[in-house]
């Protein structure tokens, strides 16, 4: 029996990096963030307490910033992250984007990473939002079909669940 690889790192610091990720099996052009063709610039972050094994990675994300070619700006992301082949969980979550900010808890569930190419229908979102402000123009980066839906809302506390195509909010 082979031993699975594990890796434990104290800290990684990224400063003003560029990353291009292209899955050549998919050539469809999409508006908004295209998870099969990402181009990220101005990527900076500190990752603390990193634990990696063959099925998951855990880390404390501190001050992650980036710009994606779609125009999406992440001004700040802080969270304790746990990512594996079927879910991404962010606790103690604080996110600031182009026009929105949100926080507390976020869970993304999927059957495989390829599901992100159909983010609106295949990635299930659940979370607990506190003291959030959401501008629909930021959601549009992930759901370009919502271009004609315009709203801005302040949320003191809400539970969210569903896919972008079928989303529910409770307070």
Can you describe what each PLM-predicted range is?
Residues 158-160:
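Membrane-embedded beta-strands that build the outer-membrane beta-barrel scaffold
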Residues 30-32, 143-146:
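Extracellular loop and loop/strand-boundary signature of outer-membrane beta-barrel proteins
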Residues 1, 165-171:
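Short, intrinsically disordered, charge-balanced linker/junction segments flanking boundaries
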Residues 86, 163-165:
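Outer-membrane beta-barrel channels and translocator barrels
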Residues 2-103, 108-125:
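Elongated, acidic membrane-bridging lipid-handling scaffolds
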Residues 132-137:
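Outer-membrane beta-barrel translocator/channel fold
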Residues 71, 150-152:
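Short sequence motifs at beta-strands and strand-loop junctions characteristic
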Residues 77, 154-156:
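Hydrophobic, lipid-facing positions within transmembrane beta-strands of outer-membrane proteins
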């Amino acid at each position: 029996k082979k031993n699975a690889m594990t890796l434990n790192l104290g800290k990684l610091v990224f400063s003003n990096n560029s990353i291009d990720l292209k899955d050549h099996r998919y050539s469809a052009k999409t508006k908004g963030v295209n998870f099969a063709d990402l181009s990220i610039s101005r990527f900076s972050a500190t990752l603390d307490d990193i634990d990696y094994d063959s099925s998951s990675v855990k880390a404390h994300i501190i001050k992650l910033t980036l710009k994606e070619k779609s125009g999406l700006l992440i001004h700040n992301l802080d969270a304790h992250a746990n990512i594996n082949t079927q879910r991404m969980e962010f606790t103690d979550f604080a996110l600031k984007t182009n026009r929105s900010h949100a926080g507390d808890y976020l869970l993304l569930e999927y059957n495989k990473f390829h599901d992100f190419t159909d983010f609106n229908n295949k990635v299930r979102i659940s979370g607990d939002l506190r003291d959030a402000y959401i501008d629909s123009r930021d959601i549009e980066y992930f759901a370009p079909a919502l271009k004609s839906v315009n709203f801005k809302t302040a949320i003191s506390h809400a539970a969210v669940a569903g896919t972008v195509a079928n989303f529910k909010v409770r307070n």
